């Protein structure tokens, strides 16, 4: 069977130069381990806020490492060195605007400055590439969505649509732990993976 391959890219000048320890990749690894019931392999990269390096890294993960999903963290704000969305769009075959729109909607429930985010979602070849926030708490909120005090979903997180998108791109059938995030697919796209 086709193993799910995920690229994780933390984009930070200071973390990549050793000024402080990266928190983005560990947060993503922990979240994916709790959310995915499908086996997966990770390719991780810690790089500076340099557009050419970001573009090169995204292309390497998709074109050479055959990742089905690439998650970036950091570099999505309005500051001059925040070029992650620009690099992502530069290597995209198609834009998926709903992902960026939904990430901002989710984050606005927690902080008004979420409107300053320029996160995007794109497709390059067989892969979905998503720009996530830089803070671990915000990463989790964006992926899982907004829940009420009882744990019921009020606003769906973006990851609910990721497994079906990967399936549409002819990648592996991805399943999630519904208590973390329930993957959504139309009934016609569901399959019994125990077969």
UniProtKB/Swiss-Prot annotation:
The keyword Ribonucleoprotein does not apply. Changing residue 82 to A: Loss of activity. It catalyses: molybdopterin + ATP + H(+) = adenylyl-molybdopterin + diphosphate. GO terms for cellular component: cytosol. Belongs to the MoaB/Mog family. The gene is mog. It holds the Pfam family MoCF_biosynth. This is Molybdopterin adenylyltransferase. It comes from Escherichia coli (strain K12). InterPro entries: MoaB/Mog-like_dom_sf, MoaB/Mog_dom, MoCF_biosynth_CS, MPT_Adenylyltrnsfr/MoaC-Rel. Catalyzes the adenylation of molybdopterin as part of the biosynthesis of the molybdenum-cofactor. SUPFAM superfamilies: Molybdenum cofactor biosynthesis proteins. Its EC number is 2.7.7.75. The keyword ATP-binding applies. GO terms for molecular function: ATP binding; identical protein binding; molybdopterin adenylyltransferase activity. PANTHER family: MOLYBDENUM COFACTOR BIOSYNTHESIS, MOLYBDOPTERIN MOLYBDOTRANSFERASE. Pathway: Cofactor biosynthesis; molybdopterin biosynthesis. It comes from the Bacteria. Disulfide bonds: none annotated.
């Amino acid at each position: 069977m086709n193993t799910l391959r995920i690229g994780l890219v933390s984009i930070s000048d200071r973390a990549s130069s050793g000024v402080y320890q990266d928190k983005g990749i560990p947060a993503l690894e922990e979240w994916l381990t709790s959310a995915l019931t499908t086996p997966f392999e990770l390719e991780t990269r810690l790089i500076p806020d340099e557009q050419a390096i970001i573009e090169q890294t995204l292309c390497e993960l998709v074109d050479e490492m055959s990742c089905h999903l690439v998650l970036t963290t950091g570099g999505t704000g309005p500051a001059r060195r925040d070029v992650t969305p620009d690099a992502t769009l530069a290597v995209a075959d198609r834009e998926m605007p709903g992902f960026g729109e939904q990430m901002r909607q989710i984050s606005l429930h927690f902080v008004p400055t979420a409107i300053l985010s320029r996160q995007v979602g794109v497709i390059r070849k067989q892969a979905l590439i998503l720009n996530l926030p830089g803070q671990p708490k915000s990463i989790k909120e964006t992926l899982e969505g907004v829940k009420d005090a009882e744990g019921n979903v009020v606003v769906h997180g973006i990851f609910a649509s990721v497994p079906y998108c990967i399936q549409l791109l002819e990648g592996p059938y991805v399943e999630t732990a519904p208590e973390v995030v329930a993957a959504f697919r139309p009934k016609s796209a569901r399959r019994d993976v125990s077969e």
